[in-house]
Amino acid sequence: TSGNRIETSIISSLPPSSRYTETEALSLSTEEKFKWFEYYKFKFSLKHYQSLRPDKNIVLTSKFGIGYLGYFNKEVGTVPFGRYFMGGTGITNFDVSANEYIGLRGYESEDISTAIGDPLAIKLSFELQKKVVETDQFMLSTHLFGEFGNTYQSLVDLDPYNLKSSIGFGGKVYAPIIGVIGIDVGWGLNKTDFNWKTPAVQFTIGMDIGDF
């Protein structure tokens, strides 16, 4: 299996309507400040699949993704929804506030982002997968992975050299009746207090969960 997949999306609210000055914005309540839901959201992802053997039993998957939640009025700032959280498997993916959960195996969902989420996220991952068993109705595979990512509070804070990293291994079961179920054992290499020595065991359901 070899190939590429590129996805880009731009989501925007209605055209900006607020005309608050800095002084006016400071006196507004949160409900008043964000009543127009003025924002735009950009996402880009690139996935590359490369077979390393003629029988296609070993495949290297490389993924890159970036997402940004922007605003039209700097006095109002970033809306309190649609933000990014990073860590874990991202199995939740979305919540009622339209926040997005980007997986970074080896970490928990609260380990990387701020408590309210961040408007900017970036992630790079590599996974080397080997088929172990394959039939018409079932496939079992094992894999090694390395992931790098972070979230930032603004574009100014973006630092591609400041990425959290993790390594690990796992396995996946593919079956038409149950879909895809996976298990990963990962080490978050940037955890503090030597917590990186204790691996995180995490489960996934479905394909591309926790990606952009």
What are these regions (language model features)?
Residues 141-145, 179-186:
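Conserved active-site loop/cleft motifs that coordinate metal ions or position small ligands
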Residues 1-132, 137, 144, 152-154, ...:
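C-terminal outer-membrane beta-barrel translocator/porin domains of Gram-negative envelope proteins
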Residues 133, 149-151, 178, 188-192:
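Short Gly/Pro-enriched loop/turn and capping motifs at secondary-structure junctions
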Residues 173, 198-212:
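Outer-membrane beta-barrel "beta-signal"
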Residues 103-105, 149-166:
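Outer-membrane beta-barrel transmembrane domain signature
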Residues 52-53, 158-160, 191-196:
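Short proline/glycine-enriched turn/loop segments at secondary-structure junctions
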Residues 185-201:
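Outer-membrane beta-barrel translocator/channel fold
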Residues 129, 166-172:
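Short glycine-rich, acidic/polar surface loops and turns
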